[in-house]
C-alpha cells in the first residue's frame, strides 16, 4: 500500500481533536503528500456508519445498559474491523493518507490498562480487527492526569471520560508504556495549542520530507 496511516493518541483532554483539525488544513498544503493523494479524516470509535452506532452504544448506552468490560472490548474490536475494512485499507490502497483520532493503542490503554483486561487477548483481537495493519506514524499527545481532569471538568463527558482518577492514571501509564514499546512520537500536550501544532508539523516533515524528495 502506498498511502499513509497517521494516528493521534492520548488521554482525555490532550487536544487530539484540535490538532486533527489543524492537520486537516496543513497537511494537504505541506508538500508532503504525493500529487493526487487525498487526506481522509476519521476517528475511533465512529469512523463508519456502523461505527457511529457502536460508538453510541459504548459511550452513551441507553438507561442502565452499560456494557461489561469484555463486551465493551468486543464492541471496540467490531468498530475497528469495520473501520479498517471499509475506510482505512481501501484509502491506503489508493495511495491516500488517513489521519485518525485514536486507533488500536487506545484500546490497549483504556481496556487493557484502564479496565485491567488481559493484554494478550486485546493484542490478539487487535491483529484480527486490523488484519495486521500498523500505523505509519503515531503521535502520543502526553498530558498529566491532573491537567486532563482540569480540562475534562470544563466540558461534558461521555461514559468513559467520566471514569475516576485511578482509572485515568492506569490509562496514562498504559499510554506511556505503549509509546515506548511501539516507538510513538511523544509530544508535550500541556503547551500552547500553536506550539503543539508546530511540533507536529516538524515531526511530519522529518519523517516524510526525505521520502518526498526521493520520489522527485
UniProtKB/Swiss-Prot annotation:
Top EC class of this enzyme: transferase
EC number per UniProt: 2.7.4.9
Keyword Kinase: yes
Annotated family: Belongs to the thymidylate kinase family.
UniProt KW Iron keyword: no
GO molecular-function term, one example from the UniProt record: dTMP kinase activity
Binding locations of ATP: 10-17
GO biological process: dTDP biosynthetic process; dTTP biosynthetic process; dUDP biosynthetic process
Keywords: ATP-binding, Kinase, Nucleotide biosynthesis, Nucleotide-binding, Transferase
Domain of life of the native organism: Bacteria
GO CC terms: cytosol
Reactions that this protein is recorded to catalyse: dTMP + ATP = dTDP + ADP
Organism: Prochlorococcus marinus (strain MIT 9303)
PANTHER family xref list: THYMIDYLATE KINASE, UMP-CMP KINASE 2, MITOCHONDRIAL
Entry-linked NCBIfam families: DTMP_kinase
CDD domains on file: TMPK
Gene3D superfamilies: P-loop containing nucleotide triphosphate hydrolases
Protein name: Thymidylate kinase
Entry-linked InterPro entries: P-loop_NTPase (IPR027417), Thymidylate_kin-like_dom (IPR039430), Thymidylate_kin_CS (IPR018095), Thymidylate_kinase (IPR018094)
Chain's role: Phosphorylation of dTMP to form dTDP in both de novo and salvage pathways of dTTP synthesis.
Amino acid at each position: 500500500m502506498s498511502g499513509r496511516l497517521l494516528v493521534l493518541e492520548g488521554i482525555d483532554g490532550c487536544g487530539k481533536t484540535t490538532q486533527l483539525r489543524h492537520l486537516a488544513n496543513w497537511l494537504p498544503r505541506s508538500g508532503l503528500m504525493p500529487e493526487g493523494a487525498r487526506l481522509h479524516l476519521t476517528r475511533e470509535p465512529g469512523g463508519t456508519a456502523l461505527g457511529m452506532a457502536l460508538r453510541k452504544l459504548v459511550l452513551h448506552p441507553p438507561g442502565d445498559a452499560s456494557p461489561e468490560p469484555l463486551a465493551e472490548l468486543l464492541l471496540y474490536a467490531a468498530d475497528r474491523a469495520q473501520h479498517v475494512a471499509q475506510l482505512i485499507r481501501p484509502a491506503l490502497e489508493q495511495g491516500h493518507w488517513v489521519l485518525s483520532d485514536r486507533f488500536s493503542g487506545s484500546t490497549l490503554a483504556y481496556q487493557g490498562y484502564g479496565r485491567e483486561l488481559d493484554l494478550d487477548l486485546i493484542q490478539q483481537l487487535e491483529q484480527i480487527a486490523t488484519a495486521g495493519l500498523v500505523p505509519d506514524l503515531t503521535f502520543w499527545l502526553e498530558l498529566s492526569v491532573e491537567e486532563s481532569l482540569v480540562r475534562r471538568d470544563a466540558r461534558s463527558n461521555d461514559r468513559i471520560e467520566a471514569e475516576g482518577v485511578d482509572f485515568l492514571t492506569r490509562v496514562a501509564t498504559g499510554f506511556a508504556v505503549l509509546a515506548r514499546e511501539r516507538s510513538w512520537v511523544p509530544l508535550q500536550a500541556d503547551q500552547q495549542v500553536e506550539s503543539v501544532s508546530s511540533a507536529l508539523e516538524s515531526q511530519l516533515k522529518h519523517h516524510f520530507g526525505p521520502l518526498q524528495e526521493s520520489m522527485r
